[in-house]
Regions:
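Peripheral, non-AAA+ core regions of ATP-driven protein-machinery
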Residues: 1-124
Length: 124
C-alpha cells in the first residue's frame, strides 16, 4: 500500500491502481511495507497522470528492486495503463525544456512523446 501526500489532484491520487496493476503485469511485486510518497512542495498542486512512471520507478528503486544509481540524472514522466503499458502525456516539450534548465542529462518519456521532447538540445 502507498500513500501520496503533498496536494495531489484526483488523477494523481488514482495513480495508485494504475501503478499497482502496471507493476504486477510487468512482473514486479509491490513492497510489503507501507510507503508514503511526499510530493513536495506541499503548497503546489500536482496534476495529471504523468507522475505514474516516476512514482512507480521511485518505489522500485526505494525498495531496491531496481538499481537507482543513474536515475537522478534523468527526468521520468509517463502515464501507466492498467495493462502495464506506457501511455503518452501532455506537455512533454515544456517538461523537456525545464529538465534541461534543471541540469538533467536526459528524459525518459513514452515513445509517443519522444520526438517532441527530442527538440530540446543537450538532453538525451
Amino acid at each position: 500500500m502507498f500513500y501520496l501526500v503533498g496536494l495531489p489532484d484526483s488523477t494523481v491520487k488514482e495513480s495508485h491502481q494504475r501503478i499497482i496493476s502496471a507493476l504486477q503485469v510487468n512482473g514486479y511485486r509491490m513492497p510489503t511495507s507501507n510507503i508514503v510518497i511526499n510530493m513536495a512542495p506541499a503548497d503546489i498542486r500536482k496534476e495529471g497522470s504523468a507522475y505514474d512512471l516516476p512514482l512507480a520507478i521511485g518505489m522500485l528503486a526505494a525498495s531496491e528492486t531496481i538499481q537507482s544509481n543513474e536515475l537522478s540524472h534523468y527526468l521520468l514522466m509517463g502515464e501507466l495503463s492498467l495493462d502495464g503499458s506506457l501511455q503518452p502525456i501532455k506537455g512533454s516539450l515544456p517538461i523537456a525544456i525545464k529538465a534541461r534548465e534543471l541540469g538533467f542529462e536526459g528524459m525518459i518519456v513514452p515513445r509517443q512523446n519522444a520526438r517532441e521532447a527530442a527538440v530540446v538540445n543537450n538532453l538525451k
